[in-house]
Amino acid sequence: HGTHKPAGLNRTYPNVLNFEGVNGLEQMKWSSPSVDQVKYDVMIPFIRQVSGPMDYTQGAMRNASKGNYYPCYSEPMSQGTRCRQLALYVVFESPFNMLCDTPSNYMREPESTAFIAEIPTVWDESIVLDGKMGEYIVTARRKGDVWYVGGITDWSARDIEVDCSFLGDKSYHATLFKDGVNAHRAGRDYKCESFPIK
């Protein structure tokens, strides 16, 4: 915990799972609205994460769109959307993930909570599919025969076409969490849909 520099100790001592060493989501309890956590989040995969796994403490269920965030120690919120919080579990490497919100908030959000509970924390394969530091990143990670794809962006809305050639010739069933039509006003707005991929 804290700002200890990751120095490769997890290679020498495999029982060391991850280090914080990051301006994680807990900072949103007291950070001024001038802090741009969303921009920070699309930079650290290219900088901090290169040196190893990190404890960011993602998973906020109270999500504020741009301009609606304010620091609140007793009921903290994230900047950005709910789907962004879910995608961070794929984009950020963290073998020992923490949950940043309260149990009652997770109980009120069973669909998001179920996704967080099911996502692996160690991976068999990881591929960065697309990205530009400070703007966006899309990462695919595989555990067994199951692939997870997560993408985050800065405050700019964008559509990204994902090249699914990494799936090979197999057929898959996809579950997609995506920002809802009102996510730019209410960060908690999202839609979950399922469809086949061939």
Where are these predicted regions, by residue range?
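Solvent-exposed beta-strand/loop surfaces of large extracellular or lumenal domains
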Residues: L176-I197
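Short, glycine-/Ser/Thr-/acidic-enriched flexible segments
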Residues: T3-H4, G24, M61, F96-M98, ...
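Carbohydrate-binding surface patches
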Residues: M133-Y172
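Active/binding-pocket-proximal capping segment
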Residues: Y106-S112, W155-R158, S165-H173, F177-A183
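Aromatic- and carboxylate-enriched substrate-binding clefts and catalytic-loop regions
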Residues: H1-M77
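Active-site proximal loops enriched in glycine and acidic residues that flank catalytic Cys/His/Asp
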Residues: H1-T3, G21, Q58, T102-P103, ...
